[in-house]
Amino acid sequence: MTLDRTFPIFTVRWLAVHGLAVPTVFFLGSISAMQFIQR
């Protein structure tokens, strides 16, 4: 019962972390690339 309640929370947390981390890394990478191209 305990694992059944903890698993969905872990999944939502994992999805939220990756959903925010992936675009952030992509955004920072594109910004740094633009600055390198301008110079």
Curated annotation (Swiss-Prot):
Q: Cofactor(s) for this protein?
A: heme b
Indicate which residues the UniProt annotation says bind heme: H18
Q: Which GO terms describe its molecular function?
A: electron transfer activity; heme binding; iron ion binding
Q: Where are the transmembrane segments?
A: 14-30
Q: Which GO terms describe its biological process?
A: photosynthetic electron transport chain
PROSITE patterns, per the entry: CYTOCHROME_B559
Compartment(s): Plastid, Chloroplast thylakoid membrane
| Source organism, top-level taxon | Eukaryota
Principal subcellular localisation of the protein: plastid
GO terms for cellular component = chloroplast thylakoid membrane; photosystem II reaction center
Which SUPFAM superfamilies does the record associate with it? Cytochrome b559 subunits
Q: Describe cofactor binding as the record notes it.
A: With its partner (PsbE) binds heme. PSII binds additional chlorophylls, carotenoids and specific lipids.
- Membrane topology, as annotated: Single-pass membrane protein
How is this protein organized at the quaternary level? Heterodimer of an alpha subunit and a beta subunit. PSII is composed of 1 copy each of membrane proteins PsbA, PsbB, PsbC, PsbD, PsbE, PsbF, PsbH, PsbI, PsbJ, PsbK, PsbL, PsbM, PsbT, PsbX, PsbY, PsbZ, Psb30/Ycf12, at least 3 peripheral proteins of the oxygen-evolving complex and a large number of cofactors. It forms dimeric complexes.
Q: What function is annotated for this protein?
A: This b-type cytochrome is tightly associated with the reaction center of photosystem II (PSII). PSII is a light-driven water:plastoquinone oxidoreductase that uses light energy to abstract electrons from H(2)O, generating O(2) and a proton gradient subsequently used for ATP formation. It consists of a core antenna complex that captures photons, and an electron transfer chain that converts photonic excitation into a charge separation.
Give the similarity note: Belongs to the PsbE/PsbF family.
According to UniProt, the name of this protein is Cytochrome b559 subunit beta
Q: Which organism is it from?
A: Pinus koraiensis
Show the taxonomic lineage: Eukaryota, Viridiplantae, Streptophyta, Embryophyta, Tracheophyta
Q: Which gene encodes it?
A: psbF
